[in-house]
Amino acid sequence: MTRLIRSKKQFLIRSLHSVFYYLGSLLHSTFEMNVFIGLLLATVVASQSSEGRDESYTYKQLCIVDDKPQVLDGFDCRNQVAVARWQNAVNTTGWTFLEVETKENYCPQLQAYSAGYLEGLLSKTVLTYHLKNAQEDYCKNFTGYCSRLSDFLTENQKWIQSSLETVAPDDLYWGAVNRTYHQVSGLIDAYEGREFKPRITYELHPILYLNLNGDFYDLEKKLNKTRDPAFEQTGGKCSGLIKVAPGNADLFISQVTMSGFQNMLRVIKLYKFGYDRQFYPGYASSFSSYPGLLYSSDDFALQTSGLAVIETTISVFNTSLFENTKPVGQLPTWIRAIVSNQLARDAREWCKLYSLYNSGTYNNQWAVLDYKKFKPNQPLPKNGLFYVLEQMPGKIVYSDLTWFVEKYSYFPSYNIPFFKEITEISGFIGQAAKMGDWFKWGASPRAKIFERDHGNVHDLDSLTALMRYNDYKNDEFSKCKCNPPYSAEAGISARGDLNPANGTYEFPGQGHVNHGALDYKGTNVELMKKLQFVAQGGPTWGKVPSFKWSEFDFKDKVNHVGHPDEWKFNTLVHKWETEINA
């Protein structure tokens, strides 16, 4: 009987696949057809399976067989170029997991393309969901803006292609850019069902758009896209914290990313490349990310170089600065972040590398911590432990702030610039004059909460508690000139969905919005050695209710394919199968 039921299900799926393929063939492009078929078929398969509840990895590998590359199942072929591990446990943990490892005895471009190709194969279903949720409607009702965006990106891609084709073969920086483009090209080719053919594609593919998602924050302003107030994120985009434990016993770095709830399909990733470690000290990196993205984008990333990197986004209120953002001569943030993570040997070099080819898009405050410089229970070094970098269009400022951590034992990051020059040119002074302390460094709600509560952090559990903190109805620092007189956006982990839709607020991002904290990540000295970190998926819960799509009034307005209904997951530390010695 079980076999009969299973065969009927398989027959139904095959039959529906044929119908879906015919209907999908009526669409205009291969990409549209793939998304259409993938979503419909995945919906049927999901109803017959335990999708999102994987208890172990699925493996694929790229092997050389009879002098030809072949994709095989498993992880132990003889002439292995790359191996990838994938686990979709979003319904049990709030996360999916990916490990990709490439082997040093093959050329770097083949390694990079293979890494992307295997990721594209393994993550295709979840990537299809994420494209549906995060990308599908991006240009809906914004055809003029998207035409301008396409023109801008096309010109930028042409400049990058020209640079890659003319730069000296031994140029280390552009060599890393080349490998990054091979990796994303492999991912695109696998997703589209194309043959394995190591190359670079410069097409404006939706997967490229996913990697540019952070850069779009500012390109939308430069290219005049009008935002929906219900999706306004002026309230805050991330929270970050660097903290030294009492007696210098431990060193923590953590970050909470905030965004629209459609972006909650997440991947905890590890890339380990067989690159020359002399030139690529960050040959391996672990990070929180999203389907189809080659970098964190939160950002939270740990490197074998000993560098841990986070960022929180800074708004550009002085829009005249975008005259400095041009399609020629500049690289988007996602590429510069990857290159800096791979090539930098210390925090200062990371800042120097990241400062090259400033695009003035995805303008962030970056915090770079060098764990090599820290010795538990010993005095902090005088310099080199901790750098902060802030970017605006046309301007980057960075400095060694080891002294700050030594003096105050912490450094908080909450979407407001620290450096005076960036504060002045960004327009934050004028914004604070209009809107008050919400936009003042040291005076905003999260600044005050960090100042009051950082002293409670002494281990990973207390770090997690602070970074997931939101008690907006009772905390004095969450009060505002609003009705009701507080905002759930005024927490270390925001929950804009909890603000009443009929409330009155000082500005849209303070009120009822599709916006909140999507996760938590944090590490310490011991976990950093293995590129591991504590993670918690989904919006914060405990002092506030857990997030449920079925109870969210935006549920019919915001795509959330592949999501669990209730996001109520515990913390975890994912242990890598790949051997890591950071």
From Swiss-Prot:
One example GO MF annotation: phospholipase activity
Protease recorded as keyword: no
Sites carrying sugar chains: N91, N141, N178, N224, N318, N502
Disulfide bond residue pairs: C139-C146, C480-C482
Enzyme Commission code(s) on record: 3.1.1.-
Keyword Hydrolase: yes
Gene Ontology CC entries for this record: extracellular region
Major location category of this protein: secreted
Signal peptide region: 1-42
Pfam families in UniProt: Phospholip_B
GO biological process, one term: phospholipid catabolic process
Keywords carried by this UniProt record: Disulfide bond, Glycoprotein, Hydrolase, Lipid degradation, Lipid metabolism, Secreted, Signal
Localization of this protein: Secreted
Top-rank EC class of the record's enzyme: hydrolase
Family to which the UniProt record says this protein belongs: Belongs to the phospholipase B-like family.
Physiological role: Putative phospholipase.
Protein name per its UniProtKB record: Putative phospholipase B-like 2
Organism: Caenorhabditis elegans
